[in-house]
Amino acid sequence: MSRASLEKNPHDVASMFDAVAKRYDLTNTVLSLGQDRFWRRETKSALRIGPADKVLDLAAGTAVSTVELAKSGAWCVAADFSVGMLAAGASRQVPKVAGDATRLPFADEVFDAVTISFGLRNVVDHKAGLREMARVTKPGGRLVVCEFSTPTNRLFSTVYKEYLMKALPAMATAVSSNPEAYVYLAESIRAWPTQAELARQIGEAGWSDVRWRNLTGGIVALHAATKPA
């Protein structure tokens, strides 16, 4: 799948991530110019978790993000619908579960916090995914969505879009096992809702106290919310 589409085929998306799994972590670090580590730390900080918490890390991929979250002392589980990605992270000592974000294999209200980083764009129905995250979260629990977004500075936004559509695919050809996946990445970012629109959608999915802030000039946005008690 090389074109971004709001009608994503789950099998195609899972297969695409299976294909990039082996070099996924290295590719992310190279293409983000090392910012991926900063984004993971900021996500953990925004989630406000501690040793008593149970945390779901959705679209966790190779579980790099789950390991970062587990440094808080919380019990953290990595979930992803790409079996290849989970297998690539087999050496990381955190629980792993294969599952679809729109039909999570968990009971109601079991997690104190749920997070998804750079995965909501790839969910076939991301609004349904947001509702599922609310279902498995305890009343008063927390949500943090870390996702690519829209730079707010017009000049920076123009430069960034040029990077997405030209430089990023070229760099991916050099370091990725499936460069076509990064063409999809670039196009899916351009098709994604703005920060304000995503905040509205999170609220409509049953979350309250929705707020967001930009990282790296708006290349990434952190949206945080709470499940009503």
UniProtKB/Swiss-Prot annotation:
Can you tell me which family this protein belongs to? Belongs to the class I-like SAM-binding methyltransferase superfamily. MenG/UbiE family.
Which gene does this sequence derive from? menG
Q: Which organism is it from?
A: Mycolicibacterium smegmatis (strain ATCC 700084 / mc(2)155) (Mycobacterium smegmatis)
Question: What Gene3D superfamilies is this protein classified in?
Answer: Vaccinia Virus protein VP39 (3.40.50.150)
Its top-level enzyme class, in one word, is: transferase
According to its UniProt entry, the function of this protein is described as:
Methyltransferase required for the conversion of demethylmenaquinol (DMKH2) to menaquinol (MKH2).
What is the catalytic activity of this protein? Answer: a 2-demethylmenaquinol + S-adenosyl-L-methionine = a menaquinol + S-adenosyl-L-homocysteine + H(+)
The name on file for this protein is Demethylmenaquinone methyltransferase
* Entry keyword set: Menaquinone biosynthesis, Methyltransferase, S-adenosyl-L-methionine, Transferase
User: Record-annotated residues binding S-adenosyl-L-methionine?
Assistant: T62, D80, D100, A101, S117
State its Enzyme Commission number(s): 2.1.1.163
